[in-house]
Amino acid sequence: MTPNVCLASDTQERQRGSTRTARIAAFAFLICILFWPCAIAMPHERPKAPESTAPTKDYLVYVVCESADKIALVRFGAQGLRVEHETHIGLMPMDINGPHGIAVSPDKQFLYVSVGHGRPDGSVWKLRTGTDKVVRYTSLGLFPATTDISPDGAFIYVANANFHGDMVPSSISVVATDEMVEVRRVTTCTMPHGSRLNPQGTKHYSACMMDDMMAEIDTRTFQVSRYFMLGTGKEMGMTGAPDKQMKMGDLTCVPTWAQPSNDGSEVYVACNKSNDIVAVDVATWKMLRRFRAGDGVYNLAMTKDGRLVATNKRGQSVSVFDPKTGKELARLPTQRKVVHGAVVTPDNHFAFISVEGVGSDPGTLEVIDLDTLKTVATVDLPAQAAGLDFWKME
């Protein structure tokens, strides 16, 4: 029986030894976690998001305030976000003039502002940056709205949106910037908006809000070269100019913006009614993808690294997308309602967002850090902050 007793004792001793070994290992593991956290990568740990830091430069942005007839110059830097000065614009002292669109010249010497209201036509104004001194202005069509400028600064393209008139085809005004002369008025579609040129300056795109289409203008001929139907399930590219109007009851997209990609190979169109974005291939003139967006997606802007910033007019928010996949990378709430425009700084660090507000609310300018995808600053502006463009860095 002795061998059996010895065997039992040996077994118990081995068990006790295994227990001690396990306890020592557990203790060592605990010490490692407590005092050397970088030595072991825990499966559930995620890298921390980068924290926003104060800007090392000053960024200056112009914003037009539609109900206040004001142009605001805003500075964002290490001291925060503040309004540098405001300038009144318009000819009618007793009525709202309604500045809506704005574009800064490539040489940063001038800004061009579309003014929607007139008697009856609206106008576009040329001012000198910094002083905001008026150089000259010229009359255009009914409610000139979104404005863009050619890469060489020679022409501005203004969408005559005709927001308050009859539902009839309107136009894009082409204005020579040196003498502020309208050289061509190109009939496109009903309620054009979202006037944007491709980076090469060879094609102009605008959204046709009441025709569910996007129009393309060849800037060499100043004629409509193609159009693209955007209705859900009816997406189709066509050549030439459109020859008929849509019925109001048939509208499913109601596009408000057409934004070319950084290389001009794609155009992204915001469908304000259906809350999605349509990506169109410029070469084949076919739809590449259609992806969900925020409530009332309105204006679009490209970051320098190819992300797409979208303002959600009804959704009181701003979305950032990977437009190649349609994945929403972030959705940021805004301080006030009726989110309007977006512009990205040349160094790709920040996006500035204009918010109109409702009723007696002031307008707002908000700043998004594009590295952290967080809102880092806000400032009140005069009522109905609308179009905006970047001026310069200091």
Describe each model-derived feature in a short phrase.
Residues 16-19, 27, 197:
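Alpha-helical and His/Cys-centered functional microenvironments
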Residues 38-394:
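Predominantly soluble domains enriched in secretory-pathway, periplasmic, or organellar proteins
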Residues 21-28, 147:
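Alpha-helical transmembrane segments
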Residues 25-37:
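Bacterial N-terminal signal peptides
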Residues 1-20:
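N-terminal secretory signal peptides that target proteins for export/translocation
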